[in-house]
Every structure is written in structure tokens, then in C-alpha cells.
Regions:
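Sequence-structural signature of mature extracellular/luminal beta-sheet repeat domains
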Residues: 1-286
Length: 286
């Protein structure tokens, strides 16, 4: 934010929080459920991907997630940052319930792309997908469905490409945008009708992402405990280590957008570090 604060979703805390430069915290609105990705819209309101709530269980070798005890489905919420008024914009698309909305990005036209990660149960899982919606609650469309575990979403600087990072496959997919809310679907065997930009070897898992002004895609990478920077051509430019095995998101701030704010979820902290390249300024960033 322009005042140096950062707004983020606390899934386990079931709230949206503003963190001031001095580290003080203030809850905004009453999100409930499991607020995840947050973005500022053209009206200055906060738009929240709410996964409906999640339970995290840790074993010696794996961190698993499942629906919370009061889970009733996911939604896209709108929160007025001044009054705290919170309301649900979308909880389904064409009669199909949203499962666990995860990440969100606005285009310059005022609409937004968002991912639905899906939900893991004991012996089955809901599929995820990529969607596009308008902030007035009038329209939501399904762009890609089903996907395995679509997580981070971002736009190229020219807004001709939408990127989706898939968690379990640790692959970055790209889809060509024909017009706002409409993507080009390539025939089989194109993955999900798009293209696979890059995949990582070994056991690494992608989470949310941000885009640099150069067009490189910066993806929070679980297990490896780093931010993976990938060029639009698919080259792994660098991996920047962070002091946490579960970095889940990254955004850029500061006067020249060279400060990277990174959520460190294993330790429950927000970290900040100087970044070698400026980030891409988000639409409607305030």
C-alpha cells in the first residue's frame, strides 16, 4: 500500500490483516472461512479469495490440508477497507460451487482472474480451475477446468498472457489472452489448452506468484524454501532462498518496487528483502 503497509490473508486466523511498517496488525472486515489471496480493485475495495477454511496436519514428512469442520464451500469476497463491510460476490460458477479460491489478479480493464485450488479429502479431491470475473458481482466465467492444483496467478506486462502455477506438479502454465476474460485454447496435447512454460525437478511445489517489470515470473516454492524466478521463455533465472521451507506468496512494494514481501507460512511471518529487479506495478495498486 502507499503508506508502506501490507495486506494479507491469514487462512488459519480466518481474517484479512493489514500489517503496518512498524509491525502492528489490524484486522480488516470479517472474512471468516479461509482468506487467501487478496487484491485491490478499481473501486479501492479488497477482493478476497476465500477457500472456505482449512485444517493443516503435519507429519514428520508431509504437511497435509483438508476442509475445516465448518467448511461449506469457497467464495470471492469484497471488503470495504474503510468500513469493514464484507460481502460474498461469488460462491459458484454456472451452478458449480467454488471449492477453494486461492489467488487473484486484476487486469487493466477492471476484471480479475482467479484460481480455485480445489480441495483435498481423505480419499478424493475436488478439481481446481482458472476463472475470470467482474468486481460488481455480475459475471464469472470458467476459463480452464479441471486442473490439478492451480495456485498462483499473474499477468504478463502487456496483459496478453495469464500465468498459472500448479502446486503438485510444480509446473508453470501460460494461456494466451484473446480479450479480457477470454483465452485461446490450443488442441490436445496442449496442457489444459495452454502451454507448459517450465517444470521443476525433484520434490518442489509451487505456490503463489508475482511478476517482475521485466516479465519474469517469481514463484513461491515450497519444500525448496525459495522464490523461483522463471523467464517467459521457460529458463530458471535464479532461485532465491528464504529462511522458511513454506514461502507461500510474494508481492512487490517500496518506492521503486524493489522490496519483495514474502509470506513465510511455516513460521507464520511476513518477511521483506531487497529484490534485484523491480516488480511489475499491479493495476489499481494504492
Amino acid at each position: 500500500m502507499s503508506d508502506g503497509s501490507v495486506i494479507l490473508g491469514e487462512i488459519s486466523g480466518r481474517k484479512v490483516t493489514r500489517i503496518a511498517p512498524d509491525g502492528s496488525k489490524t484486522e480488516i472486515g470479517k472474512a471468516g472461512g479461509g482468506p487467501n489471496g487478496v487484491a485491490t480493485g478499481p473501486d479501492g475495495a479488497l477482493y478476497v479469495c476465500n477457500n472456505g477454511g482449512a485444517v493443516y496436519q503435519t507429519s514428520p514428512s508431509f504437511l497435509s490440508t483438508g476442509p475445516g469442520p465448518d467448511y461449506k464451500g469457497g467464495s470471492i469476497q469484497r471488503i470495504d477497507p474503510k468500513t469493514g463491510e464484507t460481502r460474498v460476490l461469488y460462491s459458484e460458477c454456472n451452478g458449480h460451487k467454488l471449492s477453494a479460491p486461492n489467488d487473484i489478479v486484476f487486469d487493466s480493464e477492471g476484471g480479475f482472474y482467479f484460481t480455485d485450488l480445489g480441495k483435498r479429502y481423505a480419499n478424493q479431491r475436488d478439481h481446481g480451475g482458472l476463472y475470470y470475473a467482474l468486481p460488481d458481482g455480475s459475471k464469472v466465467v470458467e476459463l480452464v477446468y479441471p486442473m490439478l492444483t492451480p495456485n498462483g496467478v499473474g499477468l504478463s506486462p502487456d496483459e496478453r498472457t495469464v500465468y498459472v502455477a500448479d502446486t503438485e506438479s510444480s509446473r508453470l502454465f501460460a494461456f494466451d489472452i484473446v480479450e479480457p476474460g477470454k483465452i485461446k485454447h490450443e488442441p490436445f496435447p496442449a496442457p489444459y489448452g495452454g502451454r507448459c512454460v517450465c517444470g521443476l525437478p525433484g520434490f518442489q511445489r509451487f505456490d503463489s506468484l508475482a511478476v517482475e517489470a521485466s516479465g519474469n515470473i517469481c514463484i513461491a516454492t515450497l519444500i525448496a524454501g525459495c522464490i523461483t524466478v522463471i523467464s517467459p521463455e521457460g529458463e530458471v533465472v535464479r532461485q532465491v532462498k528464504v529462511p522458511d521451507v513454506y514461502p507461500t506468496n510474494i508481492c512487490f512494494g517500496g518506492p521503486d518496487l524493489r522490496i519483495a514481501y514474502i509470506t513465510l507460512s511455516a513460521s507464520g511471518q511476513l518477511g521483506a528483502m531487497e529484490w534485484p529487479e523491480p516488480g511489475l506495478r499491479l493495476n489499481f495498486m494504492v
